[in-house]
From Swiss-Prot:
Keyword Translocase (UniProt): no
Main localisation: membrane
Protein name in UniProt: Sulfate transporter CysZ
Entry's family note: Belongs to the CysZ family.
Subcellular location: Cell inner membrane
Entry GO MF terms: high-affinity sulfate:proton symporter activity
Entry GO terms, CC: plasma membrane
Topology in membrane: Multi-pass membrane protein
Function: High affinity, high specificity proton-dependent sulfate transporter, which mediates sulfate uptake. Provides the sulfur source for the cysteine synthesis pathway.
Originating species: Vibrio cholerae serotype O1 (strain ATCC 39315 / El Tor Inaba N16961)
Gene that produces this protein: cysZ
Keywords in alphabetical order: Amino-acid biosynthesis, Cell inner membrane, Cell membrane, Cysteine biosynthesis, Membrane, Sulfate transport, Transmembrane, Transmembrane helix, Transport
Upper taxonomic lineage: Bacteria, Pseudomonadati, Pseudomonadota, Gammaproteobacteria, Vibrionales
Any single Pfam family the record assigns to this protein: EI24
Amino acid sequence: MQISSRSGFGYFSYGIRLALTPGIRRFVVLPLLANIILVGGAMYYLFSHLDTWISEWIGQLPSFLSWLSYVLWPLLALTILATFSYFFSTLANFIASPFNGLLAEKVEQHLSGERIGEEGVWALVKDVPRILSREWRKLLYVLPKALGLFLLLLIPALGQTLGPIAWFLFTAWMLAIQYCDYPFDNHKISFHDMRNTLKQNQSKAYGFGMLVAFFTSIPIVNLFIVPVAVCGATAMWVMEFKIQHSPLRQ
């Protein structure tokens, strides 16, 4: 199946079509259920505390910046929603990572017409230790940067103004890495090489990640994002990145 090059935004919307495609839909179910259970519970807790958290945070602004509260409230709300959703989506992805990898494999097979690796339950079971190890690698990459940004948020004025923007950009980049990594990992391409490939294509990576981050922050909609993002990221791999890692190019 031939597909044309798209923007990062375009690959996300294409992921919606792919997730609904006959033959792929059945591989969407388990990643979807994991996300609904974890992210749904997190959103319920978040919305019962969101207003209090934002009011306390904005209350730390110096009096001469109090006029910014009208601008910062929606920005902080979006940032907290995206961060919460990213954290619990990451947890859901960790649990469902073998099934996300399988979904990416089936999407690539659908788009390219080529079989990717072994098939069957035993092949999936054999891959579980490697897949979970890869998820730990992603967490080790994220945590130091997330800690640094969290400390930025604690700085008066700076944390309330630049902090949310920095968090949103960071979340977009990490979501691009999270979902693009599944097809890369299916081909045993190292985390380092995957990250460098995305850095060389930052406009597509950030465009894709920003749209995922935006929809991840929308209640109800965010429950369905994981399989859509896996499908869209795999389409991006097939069209944009796969040729760069072809054995003929090594």
